[in-house]
Amino acid sequence: MVLLLPWLFIILWLENAQAQLEDEGNFYSENVSRILDNLLEGYDNRLRPGFGGAVTEVKTDIYVTSFGPVSDVEMEYTMDVFFRQTWTDERLKFKGPAEILSLNNLMVSKIWTPDTFFRNGKKSIAHNMTTPNKLFRLMQNGTILYTMRLTINADCPMRLVNFPMDGHACPLKFGSYAYPKTEIIYTWKKGPLYSVEVPEESSSLLQYDLIGQTVSSETIKSNTGEYVIMTVYFHLQRKMGYFMIQIYTPCIMTVILSQVSFWINKESVPARTVFGITTVLTMTTLSISARHSLPKVSYATAMDWFIAVCFAFVFSALIEFAAVNYFTNLQSQKAERQAQTAATPPVAKSKASESLQAEIVVHSDSKYHLKKRISSLTLPIVPSSEASKALSRTPILKSTPVSPPLLLPATGGTSKIDQYSRILFPVAFAGFNLVYWIVYLSKDTMEVSSTVE
């Protein structure tokens, strides 16, 4: 029994301590509830803090949890953020056991909150799963921290003159909807450098690199007063990889393929025609597909200029073959006319060839005469030996020599136009590429954002 007494004493002490803790917990919760009830008693959430007196200052900062995607066609972007606002309400000062009271979203509806809205937002969503994603903290000096999780779809004006070597500054503008700057002003809580945080893992962009962000504030005038507008610029630089693979490389290869026809014999009309028509159709298809990922802007982009020049080279190669074929036919016809003009005129038949008739008298033992006429073009066959002797005594007529057929000058081989084109076309295309890439890659294509502090 003596040994059990210490253990009984320890058990009783622990039970007493636990009861004290429970009493303190109940007292703490009852005290906090009493504090909140006292704060809300007579509180009018229709009036801003300092109504009729000092200007209410709302400090803001943004934490981006997900940035993207960015749509070029719609000129908009989407991001998921924690939007934080901090202000001081003198009516909510308290003294109690805790310096900070962490409360749920039910408290938000009972106090005054800023009427912040996004000026260039197309669609914004406040997340409510599984409960409204809102954080509310109240400090003893009346300072309030109010955080919401939002998905914002905002407008991003783009000028695509340098596409696809372009960069854009997509803004996010917000401010008070109803209160002018004489009643509410917005400031950056952590200063202009650290008030907007975008972790590297938050960016989920396929065609862009998020290279940074800048903040600014400005005052705009309207019929209802002057309002303070806070702006965040997200600087995006487009990636070139996709367009190099899908557009630029096929265009360059098509132009090179069109110039292969300069090395094909000019007499191979079907082969060169197929080269020309195929490359022209290919360039047409590439130009159409390149526009699918762009809005229907009224000006030419950098890629449009490149495709247009490539199309001009391909079309010029087809025109070059038409010129070669035309001048080849012209040369052939001219050579034929010259050959006909330079030919020897036909020789007139001599009297001997027309009227000369040889009379051969053949004597035989039967004492009769046989006369036979032969022309100068045929030689008779006389079986008689005496006739052969008589024929041998007859003078031999020489036939008129026949001139050989006329030979036209050869029109095959390589045309001088082809010879010049083999050099001029590749050199001109290489020079164009050199100038094009130097100009656009060395150019600062990032859009300048206004930073009025």
Curated annotation (Swiss-Prot):
Under PANTHER family, the record lists: NEUROTRANSMITTER GATED ION CHANNEL
A GO CC term attached to the entry: cerebellar Golgi cell to granule cell synapse
Q: Where is the signal peptide?
A: 1-19
* Gene name linked to the record: Gabra6
What is the protein's species of origin?
Mus musculus (Mouse)
Quote the SUPFAM superfamilies the UniProt record gives: Neurotransmitter-gated ion-channel transmembrane pore (SSF90112), Nicotinic receptor ligand binding domain-like (SSF63712)
The glycosylation sites annotated in the UniProt record are N31, N128, N141
Which stretches of this protein does UniProt put in the Cytoplasmic compartment?
265-270, 326-422
The protein's matches in InterPro entries, at most eight in alphabetical order, are given as: GABAA/Glycine_rcpt, GABAAa_rcpt, GABBAa6_rcpt, Gabra-1-6_TM, Neur_chan_lig-bd, Neur_chan_lig-bd_sf, Neur_channel, Neuro-gated_channel_TM_sf
GO molecular function annotations of the record: chloride channel activity; GABA-A receptor activity; transmitter-gated monoatomic ion channel activity involved in regulation of postsynaptic membrane potential
Subcellular localization is given as: Postsynaptic cell membrane; Cell membrane
Name of the protein this chain belongs to: Gamma-aminobutyric acid receptor subunit alpha-6
Q: Which domain of life is it from?
A: Eukaryota
Keyword match tRNA-binding:
no
Q: Which key words tag this protein in UniProt?
A: Cell membrane, Chloride, Chloride channel, Disulfide bond, Glycoprotein, Ion channel, Ion transport, Ligand-gated ion channel, Membrane, Phosphoprotein, Postsynaptic cell membrane, Receptor, Signal, Synapse, Transmembrane, Transmembrane helix, Transport
The Swiss-Prot or TrEMBL note on domains reads: GABAARs subunits share a common topological structure: a peptide sequence made up of a long extracellular N-terminal, four transmembrane domains, intracellular or cytoplasmic domain located between the third and the fourth transmembrane domains.
Q: Which residues lie on this side of the membrane: Extracellular?
A: 20-243, 291-304, 444-453
Give tissue specificity per the record.
Answer: Expressed in brain, in cerebellar granule cells.
Which cystines does this chain contain?
Answer: C156-C170
Is the keyword Transcription in the record? no
Topology with regard to the membrane? Multi-pass membrane protein
Using the record's annotations, give every residue carrying the modification Phosphoserine. Answer: S375
> Quick one: which residues bind 4-aminobutanoate?
R84, T147
| Any GO BP | gamma-aminobutyric acid signaling pathway
Q: Which family does it belong to?
A: Belongs to the ligand-gated ion channel (TC 1.A.9) family. Gamma-aminobutyric acid receptor (TC 1.A.9.5) subfamily. GABRA6 sub-subfamily.
| One Pfam family linked to the record | Neur_chan_LBD
Catalysis: reaction(s): chloride(in) = chloride(out)
Which stretches are transmembrane?
A: 244-264, 271-290, 305-325, 423-443
